[in-house]
Amino acid sequence: MRRPFMIRSSLTLIGVAAGLSLAACTSTENSNSNIEGTLSAAGASFPAAIYQRWFSDLAPQGIRVNYQSVGSGAGVRQFTAGTVDFGASDKPMKPEAIDKVSRGVVQIPMTAGAIAVAYNNSDCELKLTQDQLSGIFLGSIKNYSELGCDPKAIKIVHRSDGSGTTYNFTKHLSAISSEWKDNVGADKSVQWPSGIGAK
């Protein structure tokens, strides 16, 4: 039996304007900084709350940031298209994607978090092993009885859009399951072998 799992994901802030906002974050009340203006940004939903807090701390210094929590995939697309100053993604941009951005790309790790698998069965207390986790998402484990609980069908719900969380989760599944790695792989959007997609 393998140990219960924990998945950690790092979130990357992508953009040429990120340096400007980070420099402003480090200024103090006594700073003579004359940096001011408005930045537009879009991307990952996971870090949106901490970004909003950081950006509200910048507002009294004259720096406004409009961050739209639209998901990692949309954030990268908007940044690549030049419609936002910077984007945020749970998955770093690949070199071939970076090459498409003529103004350049700076990728900065901003924060980290864990991905949890939630379940809705009050009659069962689970600590999933890696084999059980991959079996559930591969569709080979279909019933709670296979996990030592009373019989009840397992209904899987996963992200349907391009998601950095999906990338990190499927990267973990690829690391713990050769079957997952060979048949599904890791990306922001994958062909899930089971379950229904939702946003």
Language model: regions and residue ranges:
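C-terminal motif of bacterial Sec signal peptides marking the signal peptidase cleavage site
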Residues: L20-A24
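Flexible loop/hinge segments at secondary-structure junctions
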Residues: C25-K199
